[in-house]
Amino acid sequence: MFDIGFSELLLVFVIGLIVLGPQRLPVAVKTVAGWIRALRSLATTVQNELTQELKLQEFQDSLKKVEKASLENLTPELKASMDELRQAAESMKRTYSANDPEQASDEAHTIHNPVVKGNETQHEGVTPAAAETQASAPEQKPEPVKANVPESTETASVAAIDAEKKSAAPVVESSPSSSDKP
């Protein structure tokens, strides 16, 4: 791998022994060996992935060649039917894109009665009546959620709601009466 001979390796070992000493040299050798193992495994992994990608690419290329060859070997009837299907699909795409999506939705939700013929001609010229006013519902306030509350507080909250409803009711002005005087 590094193209190092035995004498060169022995020289590196002796220099390492002198520089690091006998106690730190085994730890340094283990560390360097771990780095070399990690680099080798990384290189092997990259090489395997590249070969897999190349094989996959070759396989895809061969599949494309086979598909082209099989399409060229089709009978004229099959080619004609494939062309018809393509044309039908293209015309469907064009008609769908030409139509307004809302109009297509309205048409899909329209019920056509084949028994009654000329239904549209009978109602030709008739316009629907327009409403002068629209109906509306009175506003409703959400009721408070009732949890495990004692009945005394529950009746108090009901009384508060009733008082709130009464205060929301229109007040009719009246003339002062004798009961208002002290």
Curated annotation (Swiss-Prot):
Membrane topology label: Single-pass membrane protein
Record carries keyword Nucleus: no
Main location group: membrane
UniProt-recorded Gene Ontology molecular function terms: protein transmembrane transporter activity
Similarity annotation: Belongs to the TatB family.
Free-text function comment from the UniProt entry: Part of the twin-arginine translocation (Tat) system that transports large folded proteins containing a characteristic twin-arginine motif in their signal peptide across membranes. Together with TatC, TatB is part of a receptor directly interacting with Tat signal peptides. TatB may form an oligomeric binding site that transiently accommodates folded Tat precursor proteins before their translocation.
Protein name as catalogued: Sec-independent protein translocase protein TatB
